[in-house]
Amino acid sequence: FATTINVINSDNIKIENCNFYYPSASKRMLGTTSGMGSPSVMTFDANSDNNKVEKCLFEYSEGEAIRIKGDNNTIENNYFHHIDWSASELEGLMVSIYCTGDSNTFTKNTIHTTGASATVLPGTASTFSYNKVTNTGLLQSDGAVFQGTKANVANSKVHHNFVYDTDKYAFRYDAPGGDATQAGSFGIMHHNIADKTNGLMIKGNNQIIAHNTIINT
């Protein structure tokens, strides 16, 4: 019940055309409520770089869809829906897709119906592009689809995404504890569309926020 795929000390792996149906679950219904760990679907550890997940289906997982702790990994053209339906025992910031590595790319993915308040924690110097996202953060308050915390803002590139019909912020460059003076800086966010969302939240200095369309907020 720990994970469906666990990549350890491995580089240049490609996971393609895989279907993960109901891939993770705890033993709560069996009365076991301790020592379960987090029921994530796929994990890349900090020593796993230059891997790719492409054209896969992730649906009805109790925990996160993916955890990425390595660098230069790519998540491309996947379909995620009904992810982290319990929003419990998630790692770190508690998001649906969790990245802490450097220079990872999340592109051309479709996401809908998620539980955790924030959908994607991108990692440092990330690229988040050409994604379509809706109906997120159903079990928790606050949050955003793209959740850029202080450490994850610099050199991030957020562009050509369509986020719609969610109560959360579409894109967020945040600061710890709400202290705007501690916010990350030097992020780039351009050519995105947010329709019927909570809009954008941009903190920090020296950000480039250009050519975004925000309607029906």
Write out the residue ranges for each language-model feature.
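Right-handed parallel beta-helix
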Residues: 11-24, 48-63, 71-86, 100-117, ...
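Extracellular beta-strand/beta-solenoid scaffold signature
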Residues: 1-6, 29-45, 60-67, 88-98, ...
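Composition- and surface-driven signal marking solvent-exposed, interaction-prone regions
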Residues: 3-8, 203-205
